């Protein structure tokens, strides 16, 4: 990573399904960002219903690879920007929208990505915000006024 972002970070790792006793703090690689993505240094994250369902083994966890990082409602500061990102700047304070549309199906093309046929969620389909950093699509962040 560039710009002072460390190669590794601390994260709260889900090691198996169960209760809080299956969570462990560990050192993992800081997520890379791709084109159209940003890296957010997490300042706050909620414990959502999706997090508790995933942790307990309920819900759609078939493809979950362990260890996993929960936390589907993070907020923080943008510290790295991927190619093609123009609406977000380094240092922006942002809140992250957890649902990620595919941008290809009919609802997404109509601007209704919450009805996406291939909807993914931060903290479920990709690592979430119970970590020092989280990578997310730039379209999923909203600036927090200062």
Whereabouts are the PLM-identified features?
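Short structural boundary motif marking the start of a folded domain
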Residues: 5-12
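Short, solvent-exposed secondary-structure boundary/capping segments
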Residues: 52, 87, 116-117
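N-terminal Sec signal peptide and the immediately downstream disordered periplasmic leader
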Residues: 1-3, 36
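Residue-level signal for short segments within beta-strands and strand-turn junctions
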Residues: 13-16, 56, 78, 109
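Cytochrome P450 core scaffold surrounding the K-helix E-X-X-R motif
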Residues: 49-56
């Amino acid at each position: 990573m560039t710009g002072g972002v460390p190669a590794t970070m601390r994260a709260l790792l889900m090691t198996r399904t169960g209760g809080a006793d299956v969570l462990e703090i560990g050192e993992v690689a800081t997520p890379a960002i791709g084109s159209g993505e940003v890296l957010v240094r997490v300042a706050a994250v909620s414990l959502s219903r999706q997090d508790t369902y995933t942790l307990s083994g309920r819900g759609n966890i078939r493809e979950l690879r362990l260890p996993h990082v929960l936390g589907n409602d993070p907020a923080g500061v943008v510290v790295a920007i991927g190619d093609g990102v123009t609406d977000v700047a380094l240092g922006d304070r942002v809140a992250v929208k957890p649902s990620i549309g595919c941008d290809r199906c009919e609802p997404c093309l109509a601007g209704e990505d919450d009805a996406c046929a291939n909807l993914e969620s931060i903290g479920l389909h990709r690592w979430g915000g119970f970590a020092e950093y989280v990578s997310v699509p730039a379209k999923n962040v909203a600036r927090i006024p200062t």
